[in-house]
Amino acid sequence: MPNPKRRHSKARTGNRRAHDHLSAHSLSECPNCHWKKMPHRACAKCGYYKGREVLEVEDNKK
């Protein structure tokens, strides 16, 4: 198994790690309740997807 001949510098290591960050999730607006949701998924607030109710959502209002 080959081993490195020389130690990688901090700059070289940092430059490689510069692209390891995570990107933020893209959000779209629910056309039914205008709540932010992930695209291609049912809305967690109203339960609608593509104009149809696919989830039964309970109201937590007291």
UniProtKB/Swiss-Prot annotation:
SUPFAM superfamilies for this protein: Zn-binding ribosomal proteins
Mind listing the GO molecular function terms for this protein? Answer: structural constituent of ribosome
Q: Where is this region: Disordered?
A: 1-23
Query: Gene encoding this polypeptide?
Result: rpmF
Q: Which HAMAP family match?
A: Ribosomal_bL32 (MF_00340)
Keyword vocabulary terms for this entry: Ribonucleoprotein, Ribosomal protein
Q: Where is the composition biased (Basic residues)?
A: 1-19
Q: What is this protein called?
A: Large ribosomal subunit protein bL32
